Amino acid sequence: MKTLQAKLSNKKNNFVPYIMAGDHERGLEGLNETIQLLEQAGSSAIEIGVPFSDPVADGPVIEQAGLRALAKNVSLSKILDSLKSIETEVPLVIMTYFNPVYQFGIENFVAALENTAVKGLIIPDLPKEHEAYIKPFITDKDICLVPLVSLTTPISRQKELVVDAEGFIYAVAINGVTGKENAYSNQLDHHLETLSKLTDIPVLTGFGISTLTDVERFNKVSAGVIVGSKIVRDLHENKESDVIKFIKNAINF
C-alpha cells in the first residue's frame, strides 16, 4: 500500500486542505511556511494547486488565487523546485490540469517528484480512458493518481473509476465548480455511502465545504473532507489563526 492511502486509511475525520502554490505575499518562498502551519494544525494530507490560465473546475476564489500566483510568475517548474526543499511528514497531493504536465513532459514531471513529499496527483481534466498517459510512470513509484467521482456518475461508471484506484477517492459533493455553498443534493449522503461500499479505498468529500456543519455531516458518511475555497480565502486574508482553529475542530468531531 502506498503512503497516501496508508495515511488516510489509519483514521477517520481526515482533513485535507487545498492551497494554491504561490498565492502568498512572498510567492513560492511562503509555500513551506503554509505547509508547516497546515501540518501542525492536524491536516491528514495537503492538496497543492498549480495555477493555470483556464481552470475549468475552479470557482472564483481559487481562480483568483491562481491569477495572483501567475502574476508572481509561478509555474509548474518553479513549484517542483520549491517542493524539493520542503520537509513534511504529511503527504502532499498535486492538483494540476493536464496541459502544464504535458508541456513539462510527463516523464520529467514524475521524475521531478522523486525526493519530495508528493504522494498523490489529482488531474481533473484527465479522464479514466486517458490515465495511461500517467500511470505507467507512477506504477512503481510511491505516487497515487486520485480519481474524482461526481454525484451524477452512474453506479456502473463509479465501479470503473474505483476498481484500480489508489490513495483515496475524491467524491465531488456538488455539480459545478469548487466553492459553491449550500448546493448539496439531498441524495448526497446516500451517494457517499454507496460509493464507500464499492471500494476499500478511503472516500473523501470535497467541493463547496466551508462550515463545520458540512464537515460533521460528511465525516459521518465518508473518511473525511477536502476544503479548498475557505482555506484559500482565509489564508489570503491573513486569518491563519482561523484556519488552525477550523482544522483542529474539524478533526475532533
From Swiss-Prot:
Q: Which UniProt keywords apply?
A: Amino-acid biosynthesis, Aromatic amino acid biosynthesis, Lyase, Tryptophan biosynthesis
Task: Tell me the Pfam families matching this sequence.
Answer: Trp_syntA
Q: What is its EC number?
A: 4.2.1.20
Q: In which pathway does it act?
A: Amino-acid biosynthesis; L-tryptophan biosynthesis; L-tryptophan from chorismate: step 5/5
Where do the catalytic residues lie?
47, 58
Swiss-Prot/TrEMBL catalytic activity: (1S,2R)-1-C-(indol-3-yl)glycerol 3-phosphate + L-serine = D-glyceraldehyde 3-phosphate + L-tryptophan + H2O
Write down the top EC class of this protein.
Answer: lyase
**Entry GO terms, CC:** cytosol
Source domain of life: Bacteria
Q: Does the keyword Amino-acid biosynthesis apply?
A: yes
- Asked whether the keyword Lyase is assigned, the reply is yes
* GO MF entries: tryptophan synthase activity
Family classification:
Belongs to the TrpA family.
What is this protein's function? The alpha subunit is responsible for the aldol cleavage of indoleglycerol phosphate to indole and glyceraldehyde 3-phosphate.
The annotated subunit structure for this chain is: Tetramer of two alpha and two beta chains.
Query: Which NCBIfam families has this protein been placed in?
Result: trpA
Put simply, this protein is called Tryptophan synthase alpha chain
Which organism does this record belong to? Lactococcus lactis subsp. cremoris (strain SK11)
Q: Which gene encodes it?
A: trpA
